[in-house]
Amino acid sequence: MASSREIKRRIRSVKNVAQITRAMEMVSASKMRRAQRNVLATRPYADRMREVMANLTARVVGAARRGTLLEKRETVKSVALLVVTPDRGLCGSLVANVLRRAGRFITEQRAMGRTVDVYTFGRKGRDFFLRTGFAPAGEAIRLGDAPKLEAILGVAISAISGFQSGKYDELYIIYSEFINTLVQRPAIKQLLPVESPDISTTINVDYTYEPSEEDVLNSILPRYVETQIYQAVLESIASEHSARMVAMRNATNNAKDLVRDLTLSFNKARQAAITKEVSEIASGAAALIS
């Protein structure tokens, strides 16, 4: 059994760790609420964009789709994958789940004879692919807790341009979808070619487009894809802070349990030491009497 002094040192160390994890939990809770507000604030814009897209894509059919982001290639030979991860760890299994899903997607695509280029948002994803010898074709790191749209445009435009030039036949994004504080799950979404939103869920309004429906569509399609990427980044940030808050709360609770167990061990060790001293004194007294 460890000495009383050693156990006391461990108790002090665990209490210090618990203070740190408790502080990190409170910080993450504050950042999570802010990230949730950011996600909710962008949804009306995304919903409105989806309505306009549904109306436009229903009008533009056939040959008018060729050369646009709506065009589906007959043969898919090359795919681009955008992977969204945090810059920091200590958020449970969130990063591992996203990267595991990305790895499975890459394996599936290669099994079909397709090449895959990876673009990363966040340091964790970038470092993972660099370690595995899979250098990202583009990256964006240090996005912060409330990034602006401009922060993701460099990577987004590069990937979209790759599709427009014929370098890529499809474009996908993998990120951590925010469900609620306790649930975040890896999600994969096809970005290109753009799939027409369901027109049955939109209000049927006969808009007049200037200069033409095709020109407006060609202008709005890249913005639509950029908005989808931005929304995925915001969802991932909200998921990150939620997962970190829960992880730090669990760490704090585990530290409290460990302190309780160590305190019990300390009391037992102290009691054993006292019993030993009393026994030695009694033995010495008995020896003197005899």
Curated annotation (Swiss-Prot):
It is a peripheral membrane protein. It is found in: Cell membrane. The keyword Ion transport applies. Keywords: ATP synthesis, Cell membrane, CF(1), Hydrogen ion transport, Ion transport, Membrane, Transport. Pfam families: ATP-synt. GO terms for biological process: proton motive force-driven plasma membrane ATP synthesis. It comes from the Bacteria. Its main location: membrane. One of its GO terms (molecular function) is proton-transporting ATP synthase activity, rotational mechanism. One of its GO terms (cellular component) is proton-transporting ATP synthase complex. Produces ATP from ADP in the presence of a proton gradient across the membrane. The gamma chain is believed to be important in regulating ATPase activity and the flow of protons through the CF(0) complex. F-type ATPases have 2 components, CF(1) - the catalytic core - and CF(0) - the membrane proton channel. CF(1) has five subunits: alpha(3), beta(3), gamma(1), delta(1), epsilon(1). CF(0) has three main subunits: a, b and c. PANTHER family: ATP SYNTHASE GAMMA CHAIN, ATP SYNTHASE SUBUNIT GAMMA, MITOCHONDRIAL. Belongs to the ATPase gamma chain family. This is ATP synthase gamma chain. It comes from Chloroflexus aggregans (strain MD-66 / DSM 9485). The gene is atpG.
